[in-house]
Amino acid sequence: TDVMLGTEGNLLESVPENCHQIRLKNPILTNEQLAKLARVKEPGFKAQKLPMLFPVRSGPEGLEKALEYLFMLADEAIEQGVNIFILSDRGVSREMAPIPALLATAGLHHHLIRRETRTQCALVVESGEPREVHHFALLIGYGATAVNPYMAYETIYDMIDQGLVTDIVYEKAKANYIKASMKGVVKVCSKMGISTCLLYTSDAADERSS
């Protein structure tokens, strides 16, 4: 279930720099893990948040423009050395609606393939949408290296706080949720004949654009 974050080197060249990546034990991140990634200061790693939001009043046209803006921000950031993108829908309000996480992830993934910069960065999704195995599998399958389902964690916390779930502390319940979700994702991978989550990430980035 290990996944790697950072710039991928040339597969045809065996050099130490190709190993300079961040290893995660699984692609489902806690809020604390995501916060560490966002603040990463190690040489060779630079993270940036990209908003998955658009003005409600702008309608469908606003959604399209927001996606184009997202792609533009990513292109500029790559030129500045950013190699970890955190696609975030935090900040949703009556005025700002979220871009569907799968649309933003898949859209940016294929945009970067067209720009021939996909292997220079990793996509991490911070979203309130994913909560089930199917959601995680889709996001990973369409380009996300890791996912932070912050709303699922909030739901678990509220259920314990309100007494709907008893005899378990929050940290243990969260760990159980992540473990169960990962078992489901691994099962989805295995049904496709894929043995690791790393290879399932957009089918290895669409087999590196074929």
Please tell me what each predicted stretch does:
Residues 47, 51-182, 188-192, 197:
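Glycine-rich phosphate/ribose-binding loops and adjacent secondary-structure elements
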